[in-house]
Amino acid sequence: MADVGRCDYKKDILPREDSVIDMVRVATYVHQMPSAIEMIEDAKSKGYEVTCNIMAISNTQESDLDQALDMVAKSSADGIYIVDSYGALYPEQIRRTADKYTEIAEANGKFVGMHAHNNQQLAFANTIEAAARGVSLLDATMMGMGRGAGNCAMELLLSFLKNPKYNVFPVLKFIEEHMLP
């Protein structure tokens, strides 16, 4: 993740062939969108898959979010992330937001991701709601470990998805052996 205004992206983000990462997430607030677009274009030109994580959308005016989404839609970003930075959104808000993001993303050949925080213990519910609305990349961490109240718990998400390509048992084993006292 590269936060707008917090890194020297032209120097810090190496060309893809010299790096161990494949994706750059540009984290931004709506008022920083022009700088975010510059970072997106720079990372894309260096060979990365690039997403735009528009943060703090629960504190953002709808018109400002619409303008930011329009800017990302016109950029070379591969994806747009719904980011509930403060864990303040309810499932019905995620539903509307996911529909808006998905409509814009599909019209512009992009995917949508979800990054939820757990301040109201809704990160899991909101991630599931986003998935039900067509969001394809779902962020989760072991035991929900993350900033503040944490994120969506990976072990819950993997169990819920019931997809045979996902095996929750190695995650549970890691948690038991390395995270629990």
Features from the language model and the residues they span:
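Catalytic cores and adjacent flexible loops of soluble metabolic enzymes
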Residues: 1-181
